[in-house]
């Protein structure tokens, strides 16, 4: 009873803190950057991380196994992944735009887990025989961490596309790979006091320069986070194959979950390949990552909605004993 009460308290505290973090972030978007508000935002995400960590540890102690056995627990772990991804650049003293996606993703994920799922799915249960393995921690944790990283990176790519196409900016050209194609330029006339000759000088407006810097940062962080997520996904798939061979006698069965995991891996492998081509970067590679965003959700929720296949124990459908 104590563990359940503590879990309930930590769930509501973490949800409340991340809600406040989003509010603070909206304020920083409406006004000029304020150091105090920025620090409060970062401290809020750290507090959220600690609360969710306490929630997972409490559930682990109560259930006796790593809390990754059903959809509710995986969503909480996914929310935890968003918070830890957000803190990585913070401890390196790098200001970034990850909070644009990590905080909303954390509150959406945790909100859906606590309010969108049936109450019965919140309860810890004895692991089914297929999950009673040491590979549970390795495989499932790597997969959920990869989902978190790939979702964050994909959302950054979506933000890049929105800014690029809305403002009609083409920042990656074929000639020097970093060409500003359609920035707005202001024409300023000034008088040379010595020669009294009028000269027309074109200069890059400060607003567009900031937008250009923002796009570069989004592209850079998207690439970094997706690369990290791709590593996690690869480890998760390989460990899952070994686990499948031990449990079912085959490394690969083309189960719906396995199939979509392979499709997800292929999409982001294509994305990383496009990054090696200097003529196919920026908005072009961001389109591939945006497609990957949809594929991830199909992979993560598709099997759960269908309730079929070898991974059906994590579905929305609750089977009666």
Curated annotation (Swiss-Prot):
Main location: plastid
Gene Ontology BP term (one): cytochrome complex assembly
InterPro entries reported in the protein's UniProt record: Cyt_c_assembly (IPR002541), Cyt_c_biogenesis_CcsA (IPR017562), Cyt_c_biogenesis_CcsA/CcmC (IPR045062)
Transmembrane spans: 17-37, 44-64, 71-91, 98-118, 143-163, 225-245, 258-275, 286-306
UniProt function note: Required during biogenesis of c-type cytochromes (cytochrome c6 and cytochrome f) at the step of heme attachment.
Protein name: Cytochrome c biogenesis protein CcsA
Bilayer topology: Multi-pass membrane protein
Places the protein is found: Plastid, Chloroplast thylakoid membrane
Record bears the keyword Transmembrane helix: yes
GO cellular component labels: chloroplast thylakoid membrane; plasma membrane
Quaternary organization: May interact with Ccs1.
Source superkingdom: Eukaryota
PANTHER family cross-referenced by the UniProt entry: CYTOCHROME B_B6 PROTEIN-RELATED (PTHR30071:SF1), HEME EXPORTER PROTEIN C (PTHR30071)
Keywords, sorted A to Z: Chloroplast, Cytochrome c-type biogenesis, Membrane, Plastid, Thylakoid, Transmembrane, Transmembrane helix
GO molecular function: heme binding
Homology family: Belongs to the CcmF/CycK/Ccl1/NrfE/CcsA family.
